Structures are given as structure tokens and as C-alpha cells.
Curated annotation (Swiss-Prot):
GO terms for biological process: ribosome biogenesis. GTP 1 binds at residues 9-16, 56-60, 119-122. Gene3D superfamilies: 3.30.300.20, P-loop containing nucleotide triphosphate hydrolases. GTP 2 binds at residues 209-216, 256-260, 321-324. Transmembrane segments: none annotated. Residues 471-487 have a biased composition (Basic residues). This is GTPase Der. Keywords: GTP-binding, Nucleotide-binding, Repeat, Ribosome biogenesis.
Length: 487
């Protein structure tokens, strides 16, 4: 699991030069004029055997928020909140300036991992700056020369244990998804207790929403605390913070995104970063709650995240907040359902719940909808039931006959859960039109009561390996029994 490193500091301390060295390309403009970098630049960095994302930021400057430099500074502060690690650079030839002291204090408050680097420290010219750097209270500084590549080994040895810690937490945070259904269990009903949330394995929920949707208020109401950040448990990244709690007897772990807590209207780049934070939180979740503001529902950002959750195979629940402020409730509800079906057809039937995070009304319904979505996400259907259903579907609406050759659907089985995944053995799978696939997926939703959850349907030909490919058989097949052979 990679991590994110933000390079921050005053203008013209060598941030872009170091960025270019780490990514191995000249992606950032380098100039002696302060403030050349006016935006955030991301790149894939390599440092010996470490792989991580590096962000080159605009220079931190003490300026008014109304100026271009003010917007650059806010963008940099945003990057600091996003990053897992911050490398704070000062100029070893200039030494510590009052601005360095101010921003060292900001970094201590905003990021858990801050590395102090003294750049341009090659030779005796950087000795004074390296000694002065101790006064910033950020621990032992490392001497660097981004221009000549000096100090990269020291940076590696500091980043290595941090990277290992993030990798361990990533493994602990990641939910179990795309679970194989063993062949010998394909004809067995699933045990409903097998996926029931426990204290050891709580139900993992990501609440995603725009800053004014009331996300923090909703989470605070669910966990019963006044502040979201009261005793938070750090997740894999600074922007993914998880809180463990119990909700109506259900052990839960709610992932919140720091990046979407604050207004991100500074620039288009900030808006993109906020969306990126939300997308990262989706990967930690089993169920994603997309929180909408009843006054401005289904904006582009909401649709992108809901679509991404479906693509990632997560269960989705849509919650419409501030319902207590709505006057024409019945008309509004009908309008919301129509918009949902039209804008997100791939999530047809997903629960849409109205809530008031402020008063707590509707949270019982939200809890029930989340549990039901989680249950459907874990649903298993026996092969016998699937093939009975498939026969009825084919009889009601036979597959097309491209080029005069009728596509024959011979056999169907479920091969995965979390989300449900099915394989249909058929002739000419490459010629199966998308419209017929949608017909089967919608039929699965309706007949087996699986609204809203992502459904994966794969067509395989007679020459393909069987649906349980690359798995060892525990019992002899009927054909091998007939031939008198053993597996």
C-alpha cells in the first residue's frame, strides 16, 4: 500500500526540484522566482524500493486570503491535510526565517508525520541552517541537496518504517470483497450468521457527501458524540479517519473523509481533491452512504462517487438530509426517486432514505437500510434455484440470434459474493448484446430480491474453463465417476 508525501515550505526552497528528482521527470516548473508553482502537482515517486505519491505544493506565504497567493496557501494547507507525511523544506543557506517558524507551527497541528528537511545544505554553506533548524521543534533535520541528490538515503531510512506502518494499517482497514463461493458449496444456502457484524469484524461504512450536506452532523448523531474527532482512530491515510462505535446493537466502523469536511470552493483543483478523498474512503467500506442535501440533490460530485462505489462493488444507500426543512414531502420524495432511477440506473432499487441529521429523525430507517444492503451484498443463491430461474427467463424472452445463430444459455452458477457474481455458460458469449445482459441482471434483482447491490454477470463459452477454474475438486465429478477415474 503506497502513501502520500507532500513537499511543503516557503517559495523557492527547492520543493519542485526535489519533486522532479523523486518522480524522475521534470513535471514541475523550476525557477528562481518565488511562487512559480501555483497549483498542486502529483506524481508517482520512487525512492530505492519505496513507491508512493508525492505532491508538489505552492509555497506557504503569509498573505491575505483574498489574493492569488492566499488561494495558493489554502491549497497547500489542503494538501497537508490530505497527505500521510509532510516533508517541510527550509533553505539551508538562508536559515530559519519568521515565516518558517509560523508554518512549522501550522504543520505540527495539521499532520501527524512531519519530516524536517534542510535543502541546499551541501558543503559548509548549509551548516548554519542545519543547526538553526533544530529550533523549529520538529525533531532532527535531514540535510538534503535536491539539485545534487544528496541526503536521499537519509530520507529513505525515515520513510521506510512509516511506509511499513501504513501497509499494516491498510491490511487491517481493507474489507473482504470478491469472496469466492467454493464449488462444493454452490448448492448450499448461505449461513446468515457468517457475515453478521461483530466487534472484531464490524460493519464498515463510509459516509460520503459534500461539505454542506450535513455529513459530520450525521456521523456525530450516529456515534453519540459531540465532535467527530473525539477519540478518532487513524485509518490508512490522514484523510480517512475511522471511528468505532455501536449503532442499535450493531458494531460499526464509520470512515469519514477530512477532505470533504471543509468547503472546497477555492478552485477546481480543490474540488477534484475533495472528490479524490471520497473515492479513497469508498475502498475502505462495505456499505457506502451517499448523503445528499435535499435542496441540491444529485450534483455531479454525488453522482461520481455513487457510480464509483458501484464500480468498486460496494453496497450503496442514498440518504437525503435536512428532510425536516422540506415542506412538500410527498412531492419531493417522488421527484427524488425519479431522479435517482434516471441518473443512476446501475443502482436501480437501491434504498433512498430521508433523514434529519440535526434531529435524528429517520436514523432508524437508515440503520435498517444499511443492514439490508449489507445482507444483500453477501447474498448467495443455490445453483438449482438459479438454473430454474434462468430457464424461465429464456422461455419468456429467448436470447437473440446474431447472424442466424441462436445463443444458447446452458448453465448458471454463483461464483462470488461481496458483491454477488454469477457466470452463465453459453454459446457465442462475445456476441451476447448488452441489452440481454441487462435483462438478466434486472431479472436477478427482481426475482431474488437484490435491489441496488452491484451484480457481476459473466458470459463464458463452451471452450472456456468451468466457473470454478483453478480450484481443486474435493469430490469426483459425475463424468469421472462414470469413467471410473479419480481426481
Amino acid at each position: 500500500m503506497s502513501f502520500t508525501l507532500a513537499i511543503v515550505g516557503r517559495p523557492n526552497v527547492g520543493k519542485s526540484t526535489l519533486f522532479n528528482r523523486l518522480v524522475g521527470k521534470r513535471l514541475a516548473l523550476v525557477d528562481d522566482q518565488p511562487g512559480v508553482t501555483r497549483d498542486l502537482r502529483e506524481g508517482d515517486a520512487r525512492l530505492i524500493d519505496l513507491r508512493f505519491t508525492v505532491i508538489d505544493t505552492a509555497g506557504l506565504e503569509e498573505v491575505t486570503d483574498d489574493s492569488l497567493q492566499g488561494r495558493m496557501r489554502r491549497l497547500t494547507e489542503r494538501a497537508v491535510e490530505m497527505a500521510d507525511v509532510c516533508l517541510f523544506l527550509i533553505d539551508g543557506r538562508v536559515g530559519v526565517t519568521p515565516s518558517d517558524e509560523v508554518f512549522a507551527d501550522i504543520l505540527r497541528r495539521k499532520n501527524a508525520h512531519v519530516i524536517l528537511g534542510v535543502n541546499k545544505a551541501e558543503g559548509r554553506a548549509g551548516d548554519g541552517g542545519a543547526i538553526e533548524a533544530w529550533s523549529l521543534g520538529l525533531g532532527e533535520p535531514i540535510r538534503l541537496s535536491a539539485e545534487h541528490g544528496e541526503g536521499m538515503d537519509d530520507l529513505y531510512h525515515i520513510l521506510r518504517p512509516i511506509a511499513e506502518g501504513f501497509a499494516e494499517r491498510a491490511a487491517a482497514d481493507a474489507p473482504v470483497v470478491d469472496v469466492d463461493v467454493p464449488e462444493e458449496e454452490a448448492d448450499l444456502e448461505a449461513d446468515p450468521e457468517a457475515h453478521k457484524p461483530t466487534v472484531k469484524h464490524p460493519l464498515q461504512i463510509a459516509v460520503i457527501g459534500r461539505p454542506n450536506a450535513g455529513k459530520s452532523t450525521l456521523i456525530n448523531k450516529i456515534i453519540g458524540e459531540d465532535r467527530l474527532l473525539t477519540g478518532p482512530e487513524a485509518g490508512i491515510t490522514r484523510d480517512a479517519i475511522s471511528v468505532r462505535s455501536e449503532w442499535h446493537g450493531t458494531p460499526i466502523r464509520i470512515f469519514d473523509t477530512a477532505g470533504m469536511r471543509k468547503k472546497a470552493r477555492i478552485s477546481d483543483k480543490l474540488e477534484k481533491l475533495s472528490v479524490a478523498d471520497g473515492l479513497r474512503a469508498v475502498r475502505f467500506a462495505e456499505v457506502v452512504v451517499v448523503l445528499l442535501d435535499v435542496e441540491i440533490p444529485f450534483e455531479q460530485q454525488d453522482l461520481r462517487i455513487a457510480d464509483f462505489a458501484e464500480t468498486e462493488g460496494r453496497a450503496v444507500v442514498v440518504a437525503v438530509n435536512k428532510w425536516d426543512l422540506e415542506g412538500e414531502k410527498q412531492e419531493k420524495l417522488a421527484e427524488l426517486k425519479e431522479m435517482f432511477e434516471r441518473l443512476l440506473p446501475q443502482l436501480r432499487g437501491a434504498p433512498l432514505v430521508t433523514v434529519s441529521a440535526k434531529t435524528g429523525r429517520g436514523l432508524d430507517r437508515l440503520h435498517a437500510a444499511i443492514l439490508r444492503a449489507h445482507d444483500i451484498w453477501n447474498r448467495r443463491i443455490t445453483t438449482a434455484r438459479l438454473n430454474t430461474w434462468l430457464g424461465a427467463m429464456v422461455e419468456a424472452h429467448p436470447p437473440p440470434a446474431p447472424g442466424g445463430r441462436r445463443i444458447k444459455l446452458r448453465y448458471m452458477t454463483q461464483v462470488k459474493t461481496r458483491p454477488p457474481g454469477f457466470v452463465v455458460m453459453c454459446s457465442h458469449p462475445d456476441e451476447m448484446p448488452d441489452s440481454y445482459r441487462r435483462y438478466l441482471v434486472n431479472g436477478l434483482r427482481d426475482h431474488f430480491d437484490m435491489p441496488g447491490t452491484p451484480i457481476r454477470l459473466t458470459m463464458r463459452g463452451q471452450g472456456d474453463k468451468n466457473p470454478f477454474k483453478e480450484r481443486k475438486f474435493r469430490t469426483p465429478s459425475r463424468l469421472r465417476k462414470h469413467l471410473g477415474k479419480k481426481d
